[in-house]
């Protein structure tokens, strides 16, 4: 997702953080709670805190925010209101550097969320167990003991998710990358990942 940012005035009420805030538009990120990864969207941030849009209830545990360029920040939840939550950074951050680095096309990449889930694939008319390792809007990573060929068509079955038709896009046996024939919208991906991580909807 592309992002834009604008400086805003002090936030009212529970969102007041003192430092100058920047409104961030369409910047996806990962919320990491006790090692489990969830999709979120940055809404505004300052040197001392950040407001996130969530797609599920707030998870419990020690938390970090990971941006698409790989930067990670330890955060602490301060409030939650519907599908938005406010967090405080464990230490102040350089907001301008953070945003400018995130806008660098060489640093920007699609959010890929790590999961660990048993699944099955159907290939060449046969069903085989696999291990799902990550999920994005347009693909997945799996571990499969059966050799797969690049560009081979497969069907991936994961718990309550819909059937996923995909092609093998890279092979490093036993690890393989799949690209879906039809991808997910942001909200769909967030919901599926939260369910796979054992987190109910908000």
Predicted features and spans:
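Structured alpha-helical
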Residues: 1-202
């Amino acid at each position: 997702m592309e992002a834009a940012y604008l400086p805003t005035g002090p936030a009212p009420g529970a969102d007041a953080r003192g430092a100058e805030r920047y409104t961030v538009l369409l910047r996806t990120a990962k919320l990491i709670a006790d090692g489990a990864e969830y999709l979120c969207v940055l809404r505004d941030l300052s040197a001392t805190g950040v407001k996130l849009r969530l797609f599920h209830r707030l998870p419990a545990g020690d938390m970090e925010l990971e941006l698409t360029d790989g930067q990670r920040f330890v955060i602490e939840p301060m409030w939650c209101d519907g599908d938005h939550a406010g967090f405080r950074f464990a230490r102040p951050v350089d907001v301008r550097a953070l945003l400018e680095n995130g806008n660098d096309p060489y640093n920007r990449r699609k959010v890929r969320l790590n999961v660990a889930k048993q699944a099955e694939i159907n290939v060449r008319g046969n069903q085989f167990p696999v291990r799902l390792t990550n999920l994005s809007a347009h693909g997945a990573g799996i571990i499969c003991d059966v050799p797969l060929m690049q560009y081979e068509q497969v069907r991936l079955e994961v718990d309550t998710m819909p059937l996923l038709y995909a092609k093998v896009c890279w092979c490093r046996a036993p690890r393989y990358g799949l690209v879906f024939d039809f991808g997910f919208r942001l909200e769909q991906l967030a919901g599926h990942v939260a369910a796979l991580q054992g987190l109910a909807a908000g």
